[in-house]
UniProtKB/Swiss-Prot annotation:
One of its GO terms (molecular function) is GTPase activator activity. Residues 608-618 have a biased composition (Pro residues). CDD domains: PTB (cd00934), PTB_TBC1D1_like (cd01269). Phosphorylated by AKT1; insulin-induced. Also phosphorylated by AMPK in response to insulin. Insulin-stimulated phosphorylation is required for SLC2A4/GLUT4 translocation. Has no effect on SLC2A4/GLUT4 internalization. Physiological hyperinsulinemia increases phosphorylation in skeletal muscle. Insulin-stimulated phosphorylation is reduced by 39% in type 2 diabetic patients. The keyword Manganese does not apply. It comes from Homo sapiens. Changing residue 972 to K: Loss of Rab GTPase activation. Only 20% reduction of GLUT4 translocation; even. Changing residue 751 to A: 80% reduction of insulin-stimulated GLUT4 translocation. InterPro entries: DUF3350 (IPR021785), PH-like_dom_sf (IPR011993), PTB/PI_dom (IPR006020), Rab-GAP-TBC_dom (IPR000195), Rab-GAP_TBC_sf (IPR035969), Rab_GAP_TBC_domain (IPR050302). Widely expressed. Isoform 2 is the highest overexpressed in most tissues. Isoform 1 is highly expressed in skeletal muscle and heart, but was not detectable in the liver nor in adipose tissue. Isoform 2 is strongly expressed in adrenal and thyroid gland, and also in lung, kidney, colon, brain and adipose tissue. Isoform 2 is moderately expressed in skeletal muscle. Expressed in pancreatic Langerhans islets, including beta cells (at protein level). Expression is decreased by twofold in pancreatic islets in type 2 diabetes patients compared to control subjects. The modification Omega-N-methylarginine is found at residue 577. GO terms for biological process: cellular response to insulin stimulus; negative regulation of vesicle fusion; vesicle-mediated transport. This is TBC1 domain family member 4. It comes from the Eukaryota.
Length: 1298
C-alpha cells in the first residue's frame, strides 16, 4: 500500500534554527516553542463517509501496518522516531537525530536537523484527537489534507509516545497552540471587510409578520397583510386609553391578535395533515438523507464534538460587533398551526416605537439589524426562505416567507412585511435578493454533498462499529461474525482467506483484520451504490437491498432486519460492562469530546440512522432519525448508547398491553402499603433464588411494562449465541460475590425488581423463577420503558460500569416504585413531612428566595450596564489629549457646569481664559453643551432660521432617502478608531441614527459628505440625543449648514477668504502655491467640511472643537492659517505640484504634541473676524461687478466669439491644405512603385518562357539518350541519379575520384 498522498515524506527546507533542546520546554530561540520526542507510526487519508466509530479501527490498522509492513502486502514504512515541534502557529514533524536507536537520548541525539521535516501544518486546522484505550501510548489527530479546499479529504496521523503520561501533555499543548492561532484568525481581516462592503444594506420599516400555510405567496399577499395591519392599528387606537400598550423592549412580533378572515385573506388553505412535515426542503428525497455537515469539524472544539455546521458557510462578518439578541417572540408559546377554517395569525408591529431596521443581504443570509437597540433581531438563511413578494397596491412594501421551527419536528411558514422609502428602493431590494439567491444556489450546487441512506455499505459499517464499540474482543468477534453472515458467500470466503493468510494471534487482532477488509469491501461497494429513491424503477431482483425492485418491499426488508437486530444488538450492548473502562478496549475517541458531542441529543436514535442529517434537522440533535420511522413508536428500538448522556426531560410513549395511554399507569401510585410490602418480599425471594442460579445478577433492571415469556426458539437462539467466555463468566461471578455483601445494592435491586411483579392494573403477580436469559429478553422486548437511573441504581458495581439503555431521565410518573422504595423512612414520616405548616414554610422560603434572586438579577443587570457604559466610554475616549488639564482647572470647570444647569450667563472672558488652559477629556461633552447654552443665551436665532421642532426619537421612526450615502460613509468615518471600526457595531449604528435624523430634519441639506466626521466626534463625547442637539447647534446656530448646501456657495466664499488671508499675510507662500497652480480647494476643502477630523488626530480635533463651540466658524480659518504659516518653510522647499499636495495631505497632519499645542495657542491669540467680514463683502461686490459687466459686454463678447471662430476656421483650412499636399506626394510615390513592379513582372514572364523552352529541349535530348543506352545501364543510371538527388554531397565525392 502506497503512503497516503496527503502526508509529505520528502524533505523540505526547515524554517527553524537548530536548537539544543528536544524536550517539551521552550527553546532558546523562540520562548513559545515546545518539542516532544515521539514515534511517528504513520498516516492515512480518510473517506468522506468515515465516522467516529470507525476511527479506532483505522488507527489500529495504521499501527498494525507499521508493526508488520509485510502483512497483506502493505508497503508502509515502519515507525520512525521524530520530534514534534510546536511553533506558533505551525506544528512540524521533524526527523529525530539518532532515530536508529530506539529511545537513544545521547547528547548528540538531542540536536535535531533543521534542514528537513516530514510534514507541517497549522495547529488550528486539527479537528479531533483520538485516544487508544487498548494502548495508552498511542494517539492520533485528524486534519484536512488541504485546509483551504472544503472538498479535500481528512488525514489521520498516528503517533506513539514513550510514556502514557506524555500523551495528555502533547494534546494539551497542541490545543493551546490551536486556541491562540484561532484567536489570531478571528481578528478582522481584509476578507471580512470585503464581505461587509459586498453585502447590500437597506433601511426598511418593519410592519409585522403573518403566519401563512403555504411556502409560495400569491400576488396579493402583501396587500392583504397591510389591510390586516391597518385594521389592527385602528383597534389598538380605540382601546389605547383603556389598555396598556405592549412592552417597548421587544423588537419583533410585539402583539399577537387573531383576526377573522375569509379563506382568501391570506393564502389558499390546506388540510390539517399536509402541514405536518419535518421542514425538509422541497423536492428532497425522504429516504436518502443529505449530510449538511462535514463528518469532521474544521477546528478543534474543546467542548463539542460533531457540532452542527452551517450548510453554506460561517456567518458573514457584517455584524461582528453587534450583540446578538434572541428573538423574544420565539421564547413565547407559539400558536398552534391553524386548520383550514381557523383564522390567520397576524402579528403587527407597534407603531409607538422605532420600527426602522437595517435590512442586510449577505452572501448566504438575511440580517435584520435594529439601529435603536444595536442588535440583530432577525437572521434567516437563504435555505429557510421560500419566496419574496412585492405589494401591488402598496408598491413601497415587500416581504418574504420563511420557515421557522418553534419546536423540534414542527415547522410553520411566516411572512415578514417591510416598507421602504420609495418604490424604486423596493425594486432594488427585490433585484438584490434575486441575485443573492441565484449566487447562493450556484455555490451550493457546486458543492459536493455526502449522501447516505439506510442501505449504504458505509452506513452498515458505521452501525457495526457502533455495536462493537466497548465490547470485549470475544463478544465483538461474535457480533462481527453475525454481520458477516449477511454478506454473500464469495465475500465471506474472500475475507476469511485474507484474514487467515495474516495468521492473527488473538481475537483483537482478528477483529482488526476483519474490520480492515470489511472497510475496503464497503468502500468498493459504495462507489457503485445507488441511494434509495435515486435508482431506476426496474432493477434486477438478485441485487442487494439498495437495488430493490420497489421501495415498499425494501422498507419491509428494513423493518424485518431491524426486528431481527433489535434483540441481538441490545443483548450485546447490555454485556458491554464498564462504560468508562471497557469502551476503549478496541480504541475509542476521546471520551470528553464524545460526551460533549452528544450532550444536546434528546429524542433521536444514533443507532438507527445514518451519521448525516438533512439541512432542516433541529440544531439540538446530533443525529436525525430515519424519516419513515417514528421515534416514539413501539417498534422503534433505542440502541444501548455507548456515550455518556446528561438527563433529558423529553417525553416517551409506553407500549402497554391493553393499549391505554400513559395516564393508565396512575394506579401504580395508589397501591396499598401491604401489597407493596408483600410484593417487595416476594421480589427479594426471587432475587435470592435468581442470584443462586444466574451468572448475571447485575443485569436486574426496572421494568414498568407487564412481564413477557420468551418463546422457545428465542431461548435456543440466546443459549447458542449468547454464551460468554469462561474468563468473562469468572469475572462476573467475582463481581456477584463482591456485591452480595452490599446492602444498598440489594435494596436497589429489590426495589427495581418489585416493579416487574406488578401488572398494569395494579394487581400483584406471583413471582416465578426465571433465568437470566429470560430477564435479558424481557428487557430487550420493550426497551423504551427503560430509564437509565433505574439501571444505574441497581448496585454500586452496575452504576459505575454498565451503560444506560436510554439517554432519557426518569420521572416521578414513570418510576413511582423506585422513588417509593428507595427511601428508608416509614409512611408515617412521609406523611408528617407533608403537613400544611411545613409545606407553607417551604413555599414561603421558596418565594423569598425567588424574590431575592430577582433583586440580585436586577442589581447584576445594573452593574453590568454601568460596567458596559464605562467600557464604552473608555473606548470612545481612546485618544491622546493635546495639552494637560490641571486639577485647579478641573475644579473650575465643575463650578461652571453647575451654572450650566441653572442656565446662568457667565463671563465670556473667564470662559475664554479657562478654555485656553485646557479641557478635561472626561467632561468635554458636558463642556460643549455648556458652551452651546452660553451662546444661545446671548444669541437667539430668528424664527425662520430655527430648525423644525421634531424630537430625535420621532425622526428615527421615519425612513430617509439618503440611506445609501450614509451607509457607504459609515465604514469611511474613523476606520481605525475602535468605536467605529466594528462593521455595523454600536458605534456605526449610532452614527447611522444621528446622520439619518439630521437628514430628515434638514431637508435642504439632507446628508453631505463630511457631516459624518463631525457627528462622529460628537458621538465620542456624548450620547446620541445630546450629539443630535449639538449637531443642530453647529449647523443652525453657528451657521455651518451653509457650507453643506447643494450650491456650495458658502464653501466658495470660504476658499476666497482663505486665499485673501494668505495673499495679505503670507505673500511668498501664496505666490508659491499659485505658481504651482494649487488652489485652496485642493487641500482646504476637507478641513472645512470635516472640521479637520478626517486628516488630523482626534486629540487635536477635540481642541479645535473646543474653540469652535466658543468662537464659531472663524476658528477654521485661524487653524488653517496657523498650520500653513507654521510649515511655510517646508512647503516652500517642495518644488512640484505633486510634492506640495503630498506634503499638505500627509506630512502636515502628522504633527507632534508640542506643535499642536503651539498652533492651538496661536489660534487663541489670533483675531481675524474683521478681515473675514471684509473679504466676504469683497467677494459679493466682485460677484456683482462681474454679473453687471457680463450684461454690458454681451455684444463685444459676441464679436470676439465670431473672430475667434473665424481664426479657428482659417487654421483648420490651412491644416487641411497641408494634409492634401501630403496625400498628393504619397499618391505619386505609389504610382512610381506600381510602374516598377509592372516592368519587373514583364521581365520575369519572359525569363519563365525562356526557361520552359530550355526545359523542353533538355527533355528531348534525354529521350534520345535513353533510346541509345541498354536497359541495364538505364537502371544503373537511374539509381545513380537517385543517389545524387538524395545526397548532393556525393557529387563532390564522385567528382574527386580519379
Amino acid at each position: 500500500m502506497e503512503p497516503p498522498s496527503c502526508i509529505q515524506d520528502e524533505p523540505f527546507p526547515h524554517p527553524l534554527e537548530p536548537e539544543p533542546g528536544v524536550s517539551a520546554q521552550p527553546g532558546p530561540g523562540k520562548p513559545s516553542d515546545k518539542r516532544f520526542r515521539l514515534w511517528y507510526v504513520g498516516g492515512s487519508c480518510l473517506d468522506h463517509r468515515t465516522t467516529l466509530p470507525m476511527l479506532p479501527w483505522l488507527m489500529a490498522e495504521i499501527r498494525r501496518r507499521s508493526q508488520k509492513p509485510e502483512a497483506g502486502g502493505c508497503g508502509a514504512p515502519a515507525a520512525r522516531e521524530v520530534i514534534l515541534v510546536l511553533s506558533a502557529p505551525f506544528l512540524r514533524c521533524v526527523p529525530a537525530p539518532g532515530a536508529g536507536a530506539s529511545g537513544g537520548t545521547s547528547p548528540s541525539a538531542t540536536q535535531p536537523n533543521p534542514a528537513v521535516f516530514i510534514f507541517e501544518h497549522k495547529a488550528q486546522h486539527i479537528s479531533r484527537f483520538i485516544h487508544n484505550s487498548h494502548d495508552l501510548t498511542y494517539f492520533a489527530y485528524l486534519i484536512k489534507a488541504q485546509p483551504d479546499d472544503p472538498e479535500s479529504q481528512m488525514a489521520c496521523h498516528v503517533f506513539r509516545a514513550t510514556d502514557p503520561s506524555q500523551v495528555p501533555d502533547v494534546i494539551s499543548s497542541i490545543r493551546q497552540l490551536s486556541k491562540a492561532a484561532m484567536k489570531e484568525d478571528a481578528k478582522p481581516s481584509k476578507d471580512n471587510e470585503d464581505a461587509f462592503y459586498n453585502s447590500q444594506k437597506f433601511e426598511v420599516l418593519y410592519c409585522g409578520k403573518v403566519t401563512v400555510t403555504h411556502k409560495k405567496a400569491p400576488s396579493s399577499l402583501i396587500d392583504d397583510c397591510m389591510e390586516k395591519f391597518s385594521l389592527h392599528e385602528q383597534q389598538r387606537l380605540k382601546i389605547q386609553g383603556e389598555q396598556r400598550g405592549p412592552d417597548p423592549g421587544e423588537d419583533l412580533a410585539d402583539l399577537e391578535v387573531v383576526v377573522p378572515g375569509s379563506p382568501g385573506d391570506c393564502l389558499p388553505e390546506e388540510a390539517d395533515g399536509t402541514d405536518t412535515h419535518l421542514g425538509l426542503p422541497a423536492g428532497a428525497s425522504q429516504p436518502a438523507l443529505t449530510s449538511s455537515r462535514v463528518c469532521f469539524p474544521e477546528r478543534i472544539l474543546e467542548d463539542s464534538g460533531f457540532d452542527e455546521q452551517q450548510e453554506f458557510r460561517s456567518r458573514c462578518s457584517s455584524v461582528t460587533g453587534v450583540q446578538r439578541r434572541v428573538h423574544e417572540g420565539s421564547q413565547k408559546s407559539q400558536p398552534r398551526r391553524r386548520h383550514a377554517s381557523a383564522p390567520s395569525h397576524v402579528q403587527p408591529s407597534d407603531s409607538e416605537k422605532n420600527r426602522t431596521m437595517l435590512f442586510q443581504v449577505g452572501r448566504f443570509e438575511i440580517n435584520l439589524i435594529s439601529p435603536d437597540t444595536k442588535s440583530v433581531v432577525l437572521e434567516k438563511n437563504f435555505k429557510d426562505i421560500s419566496s419574496c413578494s412585492q405589494g401591488i397596491k402598496h408598491v413601497d412594501h415587500f416581504g418574504f416567507i420563511c420557515r421557522e421551527s418553534p419546536e423540534p419536528g414542527l415547522s410553520q411558514y411566516i411572512c415578514y412585511v417591510f416598507q421602504c422609502a420609495s418604490e424604486s428602493l423596493v425594486d432594488e431590494v427585490m433585484l438584490t435578493l434575486k441575485q443573492a439567491f441565484s449566487t447562493a444556489a450556484a455555490l451550493q450546487s457546486a458543492k459536493t454533498q455526502i449522501k447516505l441512506c439506510e442501505a449504504c455499505p458505509m452506513h452498515s459499517l458505521h452501525k457495526l462499529c457502533e455495536r462493537i464499540e466497548g465490547l470485549y474482543p470475544p463478544r465483538a468477534k461474535l457480533v462481527i461474525q453475525r454481520h458477516l453472515s449477511s454478506l454473500t458467500d464469495n465475500e465471506q470466503a474472500d475475507i476469511f482467506e485474507r484474514v487467515q493468510k495474516m495468521k492473527p494471534v488473538s481475537d483483537q487482532e482478528e477483529n482488526e483484520l476483519v474490520i480492515l477488509h470489511l472497510r475496503q469491501l464497503c468502500e468498493a461497494k459504495q462507489k457503485t451504490h445507488v441511494h434509495i429513491g435515486e435508482g431506476p424503477s426496474t432493477i434486477s431482483n438478485s441485487t442487494i437491498p439498495e437495488n430493490a425492485t420497489s421501495s415498499g418491499r425494501f422498507k419491509l426488508d428494513i423493518l424485518k432486519n431491524k426486528a431481527k437486530r433489535s434483540l441481538t444488538s441490545s443483548l450485546e450492548n447490555i454485556f458491554s460492562r464498564g462504560a468508562n473502562r471497557m469502551r476503549g478496549r478496541l480504541g475509542s475517541v476521546d471520551s470528553f469530546e464524545r460526551s460533549n458531542s452528544l450532550a444536546s441529543e434528546k429524542d433521536y436514535s444514533p443507532g438507527d440512522s445514518p451519521p448525516g442529517t438533512p439541512p432542516a434537522s433541529p440544531p439540538s440533535s446530533a443525529w436525525q432519525t430515519f424519516p419513515e420511522e417514528d421515534s416514539d413508536s413501539p417498534q422503534f428500538r433505542r440502541r444501548a448508547h455507548t456515550f455518556s448522556h446528561p438527563p433529558s426531560s423529553t417525553k416517551r410513549k409506553l407500549n402497554l398491553q391493553d393499549g391505554r395511554a400513559q395516564g393508565v399507569r396512575s394506579p401504580l401510585l395508589r397501591q396499598s402499603s401491604s401489597e407493596q410490602c408483600s410484593n417487595l418480599s416476594s421480589v427479594r425471594r426471587m432475587y435470592k433464588e435468581s442470584n443462586s442460579s444466574s451468572s448475571l445478577p447485575s443485569l436486574h433492571t426496572s421494568f414498568s411494562a407487564p412481564s413477557f415469556t420468551a418463546p422457545s426458539f428465542l431461548k435456543s437462539f440466546y443459549q447458542n449465541s449468547g454464551r460468554l467466555s469462561p474468563q468473562y463468566e469468572n469475572e462476573i461471578r467475582q463481581d456477584t460475590a463482591s456485591e452480595s455483601s452490599d446492602g444498598e445494592g440489594r435494596k436497589r435491586t429489590s426495589s427495581t425488581c418489585s416493579n416487574e411483579s406488578l401488572s398494569v392494573g395494579g394487581t400483584s403477580v406471583t413471582p416465578r423463577r426465571i433465568s437470566w436469559r429470560q430477564r435479558i429478553f424481557l428487557r430487550v422486548a420493550s426497551p423504551m420503558n427503560k430509564s437509565p437511573s433505574a439501571m444505574q441504581q441497581q448496585d454500586g458495581l452496575d452504576r459505575n460500569e454498565l451503560l444506560p439503555l436510554s439517554p432519557l431521565s426518569p420521572t416521578m410518573e414513570e418510576e413511582p416504585l423506585v422513588v417509593f422504595l428507595s427511601g428508608e423512612d416509614d409512611p408515617e414520616k412521609i406523611e408528617e413531612r407533608k403537613k400544611s405548616k411545613e409545606l407553607r414554610s417551604l413555599w414561603r422560603k421558596a418565594i423569598h428566595q425567588q424574590i431575592l434572586l430577582l433583586r440580585m438579577e436586577k442589581e447584576n443587570q445594573k452593574l453590568e450596564a454601568s460596567r458596559d457604559e464605562l467600557q464604552s466610554r473608555k473606548v470612545k475616549l481612546d485618544y491622546e489629549e493635546v495639552g494637560a488639564c490641571q486639577k485647579e482647572v478641573l475644579i473650575t470647570w465643575d463650578k461652571k457646569l453647575l451654572n450650566c444647569r441653572a442656565k446662568i450667563r457667565c463671563d465670556m472672558e473667564d470662559i475664554h481664559t479657562l478654555l485656553k488652559e485646557g479641557v478635561p477629556k472626561s467632561r468635554r461633552g458636558e463642556i460643549w453643551q455648556f458652551l452651546a447654552l452660553q451662546y444661545r443665551l446671548r444669541h437667539r436665532l430668528p424664527n425662520k432660521q430655527q430648525p423644525p421642532d421634531i424630537s430625535y426619537k420621532e425622526l428615527l421612526k421615519q425612513l430617509t432617502a439618503q440611506q445609501h450615502a450614509i451607509l457607504v460613509d459609515l465604514g469611511r468615518t474613523f476606520p481605525t478608531h475602535p468605536y467605529f471600526s466594528v462593521q455595523l457595531g454600536p458605534g456605526q449604528l449610532s452614527l447611522f441614527n444621528l446622520l439619518k435624523a439630521y437628514s430628515l430634519l434638514d431637508k435642504e441639506v439632507g446628508y453631505c459628505q463630511g457631516i459624518s466626521f463631525v457627528a462622529g466626534v460628537l458621538l465620542l463625547h456624548m450620547s446620541e440625543e445630546q450629539a443630535f442637539e449639538m449637531l443642530k447647534f453647529l449647523m443652525y446656530d453657528l451657521g455651518f449648514r451653509k457650507q453643506y448646501r447643494p450650491d456650495m456657495m458658502s464653501l466658495q466664499i470660504q476658499m476666497y477668504q482663505l486665499s485673501r488671508l494668505l495673499h495679505d499675510y503670507h505673500r511668498d507662500l501664496y505666490n508659491h502655491l499659485e505658481e504651482n497652480e494649487i488652489s485652496p480647494s485642493l487641500y482646504a476643502a476637507p478641513w472645512f467640511l470635516t472640521l479637520f477630523a478626517s486628516q488630523f488626530s482626534l486629540g487635536f480635533v477635540a481642541r479645535v472643537f473646543d474653540i469652535i463651540f466658543l468662537q464659531g466658524t472663524e476658528v477654521i480659518f485661524k487653524v488653517a492659517l496657523s498650520l500653513l504659516s507654521s510649515q511655510e518653510t517646508l512647503i516652500m522647499e517642495c518644488e512640484s505640484f505633486e510634492n506640495i499636495v503630498e506634503f499638505l495631505k500627509n506630512t502636515l497632519p502628522d504633527m507632534n504634541t508640542s506643535e499642536m499645542e503651539k498652533i492651538i495657542t496661536q489660534v487663541f491669540e489670533m483675531d481675524i473676524s474683521k478681515q473675514l467680514h471684509a473679504y466676504e463683502v469683497e467677494y459679493h461686490v466682485l460677484q456683482d461687478e462681474l454679473q453687471e459687466s457680463s450684461y454690458s459686454c454681451e455684444d463685444s463678447e459676441t464679436l470676439e466669439k465670431l473672430e475667434r471662430a473665424n481664426s479657428q476656421l482659417k487654421r483648420q483650412n490651412m491644416d487641411l491644405l497641408e494634409k492634401l499636399q501630403v496625400a498628393h506626394t504619397k499618391i505619386q510615390a505609389l504610382e512610381s512603385n506600381l510602374e516598377n513592379l509592372l516592368t519587373r513582372e514583364t521581365k520575369m514572364k519572359s525569363l519563365i518562357r525562356t526557361l520552359e523552352q530550355e526545359k523542353m529541349a533538355y527533355q528531348k535530348t534525354v529521350e534520345q539518350l535513353r533510346k541509345l543506352l541498354p536497359a541495364d545501364a538505364l537502371v544503373n543510371c537511374d539509381l545513380l541519379l537517385r543517389d545524387l538527388n538524395c545526397n548532393p554531397n556525393n557529387k563532390a565525392k564522385i567528382g574527386n575520384k580519379p
